[in-house]
Amino acid sequence: MNAPDKLATLLSLTREPFPASRKSYLQGSRSDLRVPMREVTLTNGETVSLYDTSGPYTEPGVAIDVRRGLPSVRTPWLDERADTEVYAGRLHQALDDGAKHEDREAERIEQLRLDAAALQRPPRRARAGANVTQMHYARRGIVTPEMEYVALRENGKREWMREYLGDAPREQRLRGNPMGAQIPAIVTPEFVRDEVARGRAIIPANINHPEVEPMAIGRNFLVKINANIGNSAVTSSIEEEVEKLVWAIRWGADNVMDLSTGRNIHTTRDWILRNSPVPIGTVPIYQALEKVGGVAEDLTWAIFRDTLIEQAEQGVDYFTIHAGVRLPFIHLTADRRTGIVSRGGSIMAKWCISHHRESFIYEHFEDICDIMKAYDVSFSLGDGLRPGSAADANDEAQFAELRTLGELTQVAWKHDVQTMIEGPGHVPMHMIQANMDEQLKHCHEAPFYTLGPLTIDIAPGYDHIASAIGAAMIGWFGTAMLCYVTPKEHLGLPDREDVKQGIVAYKIAAHAADVAKGHPGARARDDALSKARFEFRWMDQFNLSLDPDTARDFHDETLPKDASKVAHFCSMCGPKFCSMKITQEVRDYAAQRGVSEAQALGAGMAEKSSQFRQAGGEIYIPLAVDKG
């Protein structure tokens, strides 16, 4: 089977809609602005509408051909603004894809390269003197279609929530603590514009990624999650990475970073970008390092600049740039338990020490801003000196870099370049809030984007759990996007199942943070599932969960028959001791007698007391034995 057919076969595995779900759309002010949602139809006739990141892959009626890529949603919007130009772009060079491959790979890789070349569209860039960033438009009072799209997406369909959020006393009791965030009851396009203009939110949307469905990352919006994919020098293929992308967005990844460090970096990225409805981020220094044979000391500004333009032309939406790793800070890591653990950070530290000067990234930061604003690539200012163990959390190296990132944020904003700040890492629970406080203090409310943090270091194989604890906390405190951690963290490259486990763990963390912040409507899905649980609507419980497949599988391990899907008990308590069944019986008893539940409980207790006395007052009663 040739490579494209293999890709098509892989993707067919994840094209099924979720159970009882269908795609619906919120219509914007123009015919080409349609925001996808996932609607779950419940067995009681209700419909629950959910935020959807899966793109067209879960819509059965849409034909998907990975060799052609997804529809270009934003092309009409880009054309109307008339501030970009299509040009020839740089030529794809052999160096872009790294070292020569083994002979057994050559034919397959060459076919993938040819198909990827067909996928790549002629690139756009800003016209001379123009700035095409969403921040630039926002600061001029312009509401772009991307901003309206974000507003509709953040609000979703609110009608179904009224039943669950209409009890004013309960809502007052359960109201969240936004921890200083200013979350509106309804997100308007103008609110999105204002948040982007202030730098408190970004809309990562490169003009060369027209397939992207716009989304926002910001403290006053829903907490988002990022999933990492990418090949390495020792394992994984282009096909596997495209499949991981589709798999990741199925389970709820809002953004995906391609962290490829091995061969075929450019070609892998072509396949990913043209088939991605979510923003794609990269760490450009990884590819630049491949271009110099892995020797950090041989990196130059010219090579790095060429790599930035290469990736911007392909459509990468945000770059992790380790501009805060400065020569004066490197010695601060000498006494650490685990030193410098960031790959990008260690590359730049080695370069700085070798040349005994500030990094070319720091020195050329304004030149980088010129590239970013020509394509609307967002900065993700990397935490190259983040702590790699709890023992190193909140040290001077970490916070010295953070202060520098705050300074660079203001430089980026001078150019109207959208910017977010990356954060740790490994931080014990009692030290997490200090990270958020320091970031807000020094980085001027630019969105915070954290890897976890992991709260303990003794959980290899379970680091997705150890980090989801920290992620939920820092998400509540104000982090805008959480970078997932998989069970393979610190151990190996994640496979398909690891990706799912990491995403589900982080969807839990992000949702818990939204509920704690009191985000409007965040708790409605919980209430809908709780209602289904109380009414023993098992299929609805499964289908409203973050992972319907696992929920159903666990239930069916002990009660596999279809009849069990309508049973008023589960295998935990059995039919006689189900607390919810007992509660329902009390309510039925009260309704039959026209009394309150409290009165029913009192009457029931009196009845049982009378039966106890009539039976002789014995605690233990011998069972009747059938001698027949």
UniProtKB/Swiss-Prot annotation:
GO MF annotation terms: 4 iron, 4 sulfur cluster binding; carbon-carbon lyase activity; zinc ion binding
Cofactor(s) recorded in Swiss-Prot or TrEMBL: [4Fe-4S] cluster
Entry annotated with the keyword Metal-binding: yes
EC number(s) reported in the record: 4.1.99.17
GO biological process: thiamine biosynthetic process; thiamine diphosphate biosynthetic process
Record GO cellular component, one term: cytosol
Annotated binding of Zn(2+), by residue: H426, H490
UniProt-annotated binding residues for substrate: N228, M257, Y286, H322, S342, R343, G344, D383, G384, L385, R386, E422, Y449
Keyword tags: 4Fe-4S, Iron, Iron-sulfur, Lyase, Metal-binding, S-adenosyl-L-methionine, Thiamine biosynthesis, Zinc
Pathway named in the protein's UniProt entry: Cofactor biosynthesis; thiamine diphosphate biosynthesis
Annotated binding of [4Fe-4S] cluster, by residue: C570, C573, C578
Cofactor note: Binds 1 [4Fe-4S] cluster per subunit. The cluster is coordinated with 3 cysteines and an exchangeable S-adenosyl-L-methionine.
Enzyme class: lyase
Catalytic reaction list: 5-amino-1-(5-phospho-beta-D-ribosyl)imidazole + S-adenosyl-L-methionine = 4-amino-2-methyl-5-(phosphooxymethyl)pyrimidine + CO + 5'-deoxyadenosine + formate + L-methionine + 3 H(+)
Lineage top rank: taxon: Bacteria
A Pfam short name: ThiC-associated
Subunit structure of this chain's protein: Homodimer.
Purpose: Catalyzes the synthesis of the hydroxymethylpyrimidine phosphate (HMP-P) moiety of thiamine from aminoimidazole ribotide (AIR) in a radical S-adenosyl-L-methionine (SAM)-dependent reaction.
Family from the record: Belongs to the ThiC family.
HAMAP family: ThiC
Protein's name according to its UniProt entry: Phosphomethylpyrimidine synthase
